């Protein structure tokens, strides 16, 4: 799907990439309090409906992101729509000129490719590995 509505907020970008995402750059991402700050923004800034909250740090080659995911109400190892929002937000704000952006998540590295369009972005693709991290059975 295309992403058309990108809103610049103070120190952040907001967009819907299939679900709502707040993208905010931070320093020292590895020590950042994602749960505490994510929960505060998810409810405080976006109310009951909320938003996923992505904290981003620029790397030498791409970006690193940690995401507080609504519904899960905690940090997750990877969020595809969040990584996509990060790549588009970093392009929109001029932090990268690349249209194939590597994004490091806690669960690995994803690559987001896209084309800039008059009102946003189109032909958006996410690639990355998939690994089984859990298997279980539930008796009904």
Functional labels for PLM-detected ranges:
Residues 1-78, 85-140:
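Active-site proximal loop and beta-alpha junction motif in alpha/beta enzyme cores
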